[in-house]
């Protein structure tokens, strides 16, 4: 954001800050969401560049087996990332709501409480992941020829997991107060750093999979440290007394965070199960699948970013008691989703082979390219389903209505898993992805039914 311009207003002895960051509750909904979401979308792109750098550089300079080893870790690492994202939702919804209500004392209390809680949680999860990397990868039926490299990559990843966890929490905090440009700047910096270090360690020093993991760890660590310093600097501008830790605020946060963590992590566990379905098809099929999983993540994160932008928009307007703006914001998000769904279709239809070659290189076989291309083109037709699902889920999260959101996502997962587990072993690997659009559509219908019951938004408390 631009430098914060504010004035202090006395209201019953409490300092209130009128800030340019309040555009989410003042500007036209489509303009506000576009301005807010675009840095998040760009940030998602750079997040995937950050993630894909390992895969592309390893695939080009080491080979498809090393690419498969890195790709085999993706489903498992996503589980742990999604725990961080889900945890951030609980804190972010409350931070947005208190920010919209200009209750900066409670806002800073929930920030402090959540950071202390999640720092401890991230260290424990990192230790768990490091100690059990080999059993977890074996459980996923990782091919024997890439198992050792996959475990090595995973262990280095978990050493740096607290940095990744805290960075994701702080990114949510930034967006909750309308600061979406700062996470973008940090992501661009860390992405560029990660690419250069990947090239140096993998291509230059010949460290292979270990070098790729180490480069990511260092970039994550630096990004997390800068995030902490900048965020604390921003918080000092909101003058108010607060508690470092508050049990009641922790319980309020967990009521929102737990369903979100369950949703995020359960879906990722489901993707691990899908990974286990893919693994028996062999290393080349896994390489093709892993390549398109990365591409799916790029486009998915566009729609996820729009949904994530909707949540603080809704929560801030709810806190400011401007409920009439919520439905308009939802419709604006659907317009953005349609535009990006059309763009995704055009890009995939025209460039799917070239995109696959970025990952598979000259070492990729015909099978790897076929799996990657078929999977990619199928999803290109149906990304609009994901878009409208994410926008609807974003409204529910912003309102703090978590259980219908959780149920809808579980149905989505159940459809995807059922088709993959039952049909893929019998009829071929294509059934791993054929059920995905049906899951997205079912998710949207359930979430929308829950949302319709709340129109107009007058059945949810402001705080």
Q: What positions do the PLM features span?
A:
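Helix-terminus/linker motif at the lipid-water interface of multi-pass membrane proteins
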Residues: 45, 49-67, 137-144, 200-207, ...
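Short alpha-helical transmembrane segments in multi-pass integral membrane proteins
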Residues: 1-37, 95-160, 204-258, 314-381, ...
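Transmembrane alpha-helix boundary and packing residues in multipass membrane permease domains
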Residues: 40, 44, 56, 93, ...
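Hydrophobic transmembrane alpha-helices of multi-pass small-molecule transporters
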Residues: 79-82, 194-198, 223-228, 298-301, ...
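Short runs within selected transmembrane alpha-helices of multi-pass transporters and secretion channels
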Residues: 88, 157-175, 183-191, 212-225, ...
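Small-residue-rich hydrophobic transmembrane alpha-helices
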Residues: 67-127, 164-183, 288-352, 386-400, ...
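Transmembrane helical elements of multi-pass membrane transporters/channels
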Residues: 35-54, 156, 190, 219-223, ...
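N-terminal transmembrane alpha-helices
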Residues: 25-61, 75-90, 94, 119-126, ...
